[in-house]
């Protein structure tokens, strides 16, 4: 009996000691979590919360393209309000998130262009300083905006998906200098596109067009818009595509975002197939950078991923969502001359600005888009 009592007393003593220790541990968990928890959602960058200020209350337009000429002149392309998607964020004029969600404002089977704000220019604070509304009748959707890096006049080029055209504007937006393709007329020949998506330049002014959502090809033109060559067909094999969404160039190669086939295909400048990088998860944008890397936006997972020139994954960051710093269809991105990254966060109806963190590893930063030496 004595042994039993001693055993029982010791047992209960240990139980209470254990409970006290457990209570102390539980009490300490929140403090520990605050010190050591969390997720690194924005990689080597800090997001500038609420940077985009549309100046319009109840902004509900998808932002699908962005090009940073410099930190004080950032071009964005927005989809017409009549193509608004239901259930996405609404923004206040000052960029704050409103409580409501977007509503469909059109019949999906009867698209009629109605509203404006297709091409806007923002300053360093994210405020609208230019609205190219003078071109509303010419532009239906500025799916890709790019400034020719080899042109001393810095012409602004627009890939107008719904009008099936490429447009070249003077830098100040006062002149329409060149039209490639026939307005509103889709096709698959030397003079027509069908839902083109983007383009990239070579030093001689020639350019490659990702054509695109309906056609499955890459088309090359000279600097005056004269057709030179094309390649590609619908499919899953080499040199075949399923939604050619983005193109990039370096001194010897062309990189093509074969979006729905989840891969990057690589070609020489004449369209000869060289290689492919599978498993890239719905890439909407591919760029080559000055530090000899290839960066993509992999929108299935909300990731930005950097590769070496042989296709080896080096670094990735980002996730899906609508909070500041995360994305839902990062349709385009660009880097300014100060290293800031701008993301056309399409389904969240905004453009986001990311600035490098203090002391960030430079190897993890997205470099400036490559300008090939002449």
Question: Which residues fall in each region the model found?
Answer:
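Bacterial N-terminal signal peptides
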Residues: 18-28
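Intrinsically disordered, low-complexity, compositionally biased regions/tails
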Residues: 12, 21-22, 185, 371
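Short intrinsically disordered, low-complexity coil segments enriched in acidic
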Residues: 1-3, 27, 58
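Sec/Tat signal peptide C-region and signal peptidase I cleavage site
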Residues: 11, 29-33
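Bacterial N-terminal signal peptides that target proteins for export
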Residues: 3-20
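Eukaryotic scaffold repeat domains enriched in small/polar residues
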Residues: 34-374
């Amino acid at each position: 009996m004595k042994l039993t009592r001693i055993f029982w007393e010791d047992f209960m003593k240990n139980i209470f000691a254990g409970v006290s220790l457990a209570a102390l541990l539980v009490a300490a968990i929140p403090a520990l979590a605050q010190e050591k928890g969390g997720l690194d959602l924005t990689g080597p960058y800090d997001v500038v919360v609420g940077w985009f200020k549309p100046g319009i209350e109840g902004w509900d337009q998808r932002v699908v393209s962005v090009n940073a000429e410099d930190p004080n002149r950032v071009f964005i392309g927005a989809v017409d309000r009549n193509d608004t998607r239901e259930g996405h964020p609404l923004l206040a004029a000052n960029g704050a998130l409103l409580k409501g969600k977007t509503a469909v404002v059109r019949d999906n089977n009867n698209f009629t262009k109605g509203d404006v704000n297709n091409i806007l220019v923002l300053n360093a604070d994210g405020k609208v300083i230019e609205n190219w509304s003078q071109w509303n009748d010419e532009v239906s959707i500025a799916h890709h905006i790019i400034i020719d890096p080899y042109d001393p006049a810095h012409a602004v080029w627009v890939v107008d998906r719904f009008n099936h055209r490429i447009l070249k504007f003077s830098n100040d937006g006062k002149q329409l200098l060149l039209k490639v393709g026939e307005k509103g007329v889709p096709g698959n020949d030397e003079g027509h596109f069908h839902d083109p998506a983007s383009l990239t330049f070579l030093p001689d002014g020639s350019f490659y067009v990702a054509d695109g959502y309906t056609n499955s090809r890459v088309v090359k033109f000279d600097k005056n818009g004269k057709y030179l060559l094309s390649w590609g067909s619908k499919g899953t094999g080499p040199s075949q595509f399923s939604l050619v969404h983005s193109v990039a160039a370096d001194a010897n190669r062309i990189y093509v975002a074969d979006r729905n086939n989840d891969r990057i295909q690589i070609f020489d400048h004449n369209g000869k197939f060289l290689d492919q990088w599978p498993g890239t998860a719905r890439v909407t944008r591919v760029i080559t950078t000055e530090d000899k890397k290839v960066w993509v936006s992999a929108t299935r997972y909300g990731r930005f991923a950097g590769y070496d020139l042989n296709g080896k994954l080096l670094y990735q960051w980002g996730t899906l969502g609508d909070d500041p710093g995360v994305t839902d269809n990062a349709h385009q991105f660009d880097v300014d001359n100060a290293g800031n990254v701008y993301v056309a966060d399409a389904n969240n109806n905004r453009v986001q600005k990311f600035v490098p963190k203090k002391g960030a590893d430079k190897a993890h930063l997205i470099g400036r888009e490559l300008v090939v030496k002449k």
